[in-house]
């Protein structure tokens, strides 16, 4: 996928916004550039779906939002986390509160390394994932990454009562 972007860098600018699973990536950029990209993808018979989003998330076009976030986050007093946190920027464990602040800012312009994050967690002993909130998108992505892990979704109060850990 990156090769396709590199080959066409003079025709349009698009960045990988999400690496969700093998065969599923999300690209981000200006609408006009994404339209050109869609044309290229269709000509190569590569399946694509234009997502209805309000901004070019997780790419360099979010620079202004990054600066706003930087100013706001620096005002906050974070505490060290008692639980392990995995950054979607690095797909690795966040080591301390200062790194957490930096990564929360960086994630605005950088791609989400979902697939790598899930692999990191599995390789470090996580074998049960619980998705909280409407839908099952993340659960589906996790199952595409590794069918052997246990997954649950919690959408209702009864889902909580039925949850078996």
Please state what every model-predicted region is.
Residues 1-144, 152, 158-165:
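Acyltransferase
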């Amino acid at each position: 996928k990156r090769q396709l972007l590199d080959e066409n860098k003079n025709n349009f600018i698009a960045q990988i916004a999400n690496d969700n699973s093998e065969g599923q990536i999300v690209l981000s950029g200006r609408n006009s550039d994404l339209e050109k990209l869609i044309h290229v993808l269709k000509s190569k018979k590569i399946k694509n779906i234009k997502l209805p989003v309000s901004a070019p998330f997780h790419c360099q076009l979010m620079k202004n939002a990054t600066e706003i976030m930087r100013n706001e986050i620096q005002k906050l007093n974070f505490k060290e986390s008692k639980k392990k946190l995995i950054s979607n920027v690095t797909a690795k464990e966040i080591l301390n509160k200062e790194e957490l602040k930096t990564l929360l800012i960086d994630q605005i312009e950088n791609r989400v390394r979902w697939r790598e994050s899930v692999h990191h967690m599995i390789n470090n002993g996580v074998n049960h994932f619980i998705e909280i909130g409407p839908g099952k998108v993340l659960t589906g992505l996790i199952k595409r990454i590794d069918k052997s892990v246990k997954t649950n979704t919690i959408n209702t109060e009864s889902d909580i009562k039925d949850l078996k850990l």
